[in-house]
UniProtKB/Swiss-Prot annotation:
Organism: Rickettsia akari (strain Hartford)
Bridged cysteine pairs (disulfide): none
Any GO CC annotation of this UniProt entry: small ribosomal subunit
Position of the signal peptide: none
Gene: rpsS
Protein name per UniProt: Small ribosomal subunit protein uS19
Length: 92
């Protein structure tokens, strides 16, 4: 079920403060965050976030196509190694 429109997008408050500080200073540092649940806003475009995937921090460079999605959508938590190979084929 989607979030109701009248509530607006959810973004952790500290994340907005960090982005605004970097905009004022003009620096382009990586913003380290554990907040996978935060929605990407238009002011985030051009910044690089280090999003935690449960094990390490994954760099996510935000562009215009990402606006409206969650930060966690771009930092996968599971690694797919492929389906199990057929053992009968290996014996030949």
């Amino acid at each position: 079920m989607a979030r109701s429109i009248w509530k607006g997008p959810f973004v952790d408050g500290y994340l907005i403060k960090k982005v605004q500080k970097l905009m004022e200073s003009g620096k382009s540092e990586m913003i380290k965050t554990w907040s996978r649940r935060s929605t990407i806003l238009p002011i985030f475009v051009g910044f690089t976030f280090s999003v935690h995937n449960g094990n390490k921090f994954v760099p996510v460079s935000v562009n215009e196509e990402m606006v409206g999605k969650k930060l966690g959508d771009f930092a996968p938590t599971r690694t797919f190694y492929g389906h199990g190979a057929d053992k009968k084929v290996k014996r030949k």
